[in-house]
């Protein structure tokens, strides 16, 4: 019997789940919005909300705990510098999950996960910067 077993397996091994959630959390912090399946969205929400709470603590131990989960120093610095200061007065509820229909190929339920007061220019900012740099290089 499966009594008291919290969380979804998502048809993956434990190490695959851990790596997938670390990558999804890093993408969500970087772009401030991701599109994924509904079960993955429901699983990633408490992970990222706990990371934002770590960012609000702001001490060295909290930063090291965040790095142990995300494993990307640039993402952790954005979490602690930008996102934690944005939600300094909010107690939880940093993320929103919106249902986004069904995927064409396998009819899986899709969802959009985003920060509540997100920066609308954060999504695709790296691509926009890369394209602008390429255009300047071509023009020069």
From Swiss-Prot:
Note the SUPFAM superfamilies from the entry. Answer: Prokaryotic ribosomal protein L17 (SSF64263)
Q: Which GO terms describe its biological process?
A: translation
Report a single Gene Ontology molecular function: structural constituent of ribosome
A Pfam family assignment: Ribosomal_L17
Per the record, GO CC terms? cytosolic large ribosomal subunit
Q: Which cysteines are joined by disulfide bonds?
A: none
Keyword tags: Ribonucleoprotein, Ribosomal protein
Q: Its quaternary structure?
A: Part of the 50S ribosomal subunit. Contacts protein L32.
Spell out the protein name for this chain.
Answer: Large ribosomal subunit protein bL17
Q: Mind giving the lineage of the organism this protein is from?
A: Bacteria, Pseudomonadati, Pseudomonadota, Alphaproteobacteria, Hyphomicrobiales
Q: Which gene encodes it?
A: rplQ
